[in-house]
């Protein structure tokens, strides 16, 4: 068994090919494995694609930093969800041209100004995934706050 690394310094991932196409099992020290695959004809659609994982990474990065700051502000968060949409280029490399993230929050005391502040902090300082794609992909963030 591998020892857990200090994730603040180094991240180690492993992928293992599971078939004769592009189906991989990926893991990070100490976490459950995930399946990564591509759509036919290259793959069999048996897992997440790399771009889907990027969207999940960006969403969880923004979500983690936003929730951390909202909680430090003593805000109540009853529900929190992020829906992300990536619009792909049609020419190679067929990565994202733009990404839209929508935060859906239920809270009795979070105001738009609070979210504007934590989104700005996430984008400019605290979300490493966003930092890595900045300048390459247009990222927009919308939000919907409900009090019920």
Predicted segments, located by residue:
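Extended beta-strand/beta-hairpin segments
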Residues: 1-56, 67-148
């Amino acid at each position: 068994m591998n020892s857990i690394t200090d994730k603040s310094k180094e991240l180690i991932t492993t992928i293992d090919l599971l078939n004769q196409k592009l189906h991989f099992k990926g893991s990070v020290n100490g976490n459950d494995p995930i399946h990564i695959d591509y759509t036919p004809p290259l793959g069999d659609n048996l897992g997440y694609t790399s771009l889907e994982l990027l969207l999940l990474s960006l969403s969880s990065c923004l979500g983690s930093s936003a929730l951390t700051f909202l909680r430090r502000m003593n805000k109540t968060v009853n529900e929190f969800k992020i829906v992300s949409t990536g619009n792909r280029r049609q020419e190679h490399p067929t990565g994202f041209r733009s990404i839209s993230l929508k935060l859906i929050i239920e809270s009795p005391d979070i105001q738009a100004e609070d979210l504007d502040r934590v989104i700005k902090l996430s984008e400019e300082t605290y979300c490493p995934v966003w930092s890595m794609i900045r300048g390459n992909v247009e990222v927009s963030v919308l939000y919907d706050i409900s009090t019920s």
